[in-house]
Amino acid sequence: MKTDVLLKDLAAVFRWTARLNMHEGIANHFSIKLDQEDNNNNNNSFYINRPGQHFSKMKASDLLLVNENDIDMLRDRPDIIDPTAVNIHGTIHSKVKDANCILHCHSKYATILSTFADMTLPPIDQNTMRYFNRITYYDDF
């Protein structure tokens, strides 16, 4: 899929997330890894939202390209991008090759789940079965 289409789709995901009222807090970020053909086969470049941009107003042109070579510099520039976003998304995109799109938000239910000692979501009923084998846990962060 071409980069411009991916960016428009990701911007729509931001707006839909706001519509669903799942944009609580300021430290939420979504990213999309570039298609290798559009990225000179560089697997670790991705687009991500800038800090402070309201999800309901997101446009494709608001998304910031993070190149693998820029990650160290961007970690020291919170005015450009949230350093936690660079760390989280950069690490996941480089370690989990199938993670082409990462949606990191602090929804009420995910926040509650994160307070438990065991933060995994066991497939114990119909509601949780929809996530069975569809969630990746990265325990070394």
What are these regions (language model features)?
Residues 1-141:
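Glycine-rich flexible loops
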